[in-house]
A protein has these predicted regions:
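Structured, active/binding-site neighborhoods that engage oxygen-rich ligands
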Residues: 3, 35-36, 80
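Short, glycine/acidic-enriched capping/hinge loops at junctions between secondary-structure elements
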Residues: 22-24, 39-40
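Acidic two-metal-ion nuclease catalytic site recognized across multiple nuclease folds
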Residues: 147-164
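Generic beta-structure capping elements
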Residues: 31-33, 74
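Structured nucleic-acid-interacting core domains from mobile-element enzymes and related host factors
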Residues: 2-11
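A short, polar/acidic, helix/strand-boundary loop motif
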Residues: 34-52
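Short beta-strand scaffold segments in enzyme catalytic cores
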Residues: 26-30
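RNase H catalytic domain
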Residues: 10-23, 57-137, 141, 145-146, ...
Length: 164
């Protein structure tokens, strides 16, 4: 990570689900110069991909005004959905992957598309669990939130609507 551009916000995110689906959580870290902010939240029943998406959404959604952002994640699902245009294609096709298959997590993809449109975002993929400090911190936050007591976790309403 190069901190040579003082006008760039560096965002990091990760998601986790135990059992997949099962209890889950996301973790996110924002860095702007010397300022660091962390976010996490646990959910009673969700999937790892929903939490990966929500980590990115939470990081980008916390930013005020239009920002230049480099978002680093170990989720190829998140990166490919945006960078390969999958999410926009699914959106244009009423959230269908093809004639027969619905796209998964349309609510989260819509939210991610919306927050990306508010900023100038570039994505960087890193391999998880390789000692990258911010990715490791996001992993700790996500897993901590997934393992938190159920009284600290919230319900993933859309997941429950879609999956009963």
């Amino acid at each position: 990570m190069a901190n040579d551009n003082h006008n760039t916000v560096y965002a990091f995110s990760d998601g986790s689900a135990i059992g997949n689906p099962g209890p889950g959580g996301y973790g996110a870290v924002l860095k702007y110069g010397e300022n660091v902010k962390e976010f996490s939240q646990g959910f009673k029943h969700t999937t790892n991909n929903r939490m990966e998406l929500l980590g990115a959404i939470s990081a980008l959604g916390a930013l005020k005004g239009r920002q230049r952002v480099v978002l680093t994640t170990d989720s190829q699902y998140v990166i490919n959905g945006i960078e390969k245009g999958w999410a926009k294609k699914w959106q244009a096709n009423s959230w269908m992957r093809n004639r027969k298959e619905k796209a998964l997590n349309p609510d989260m993809w819509q939210r991610l598309l919306d927050v990306c449109a508010r900023h100038d975002v570039s994505f960087e993929w890193i391999r998880g669990h390789t000692g990258h400090p911010e990715n490791e911190r996001c992993d700790e936050l996500a897993n901590g939130a997934a393992r938190a007591s159920s009284s600290e976790q919230i319900v993933d309403e859309e997941f429950m609507k879609l999956n009963g």
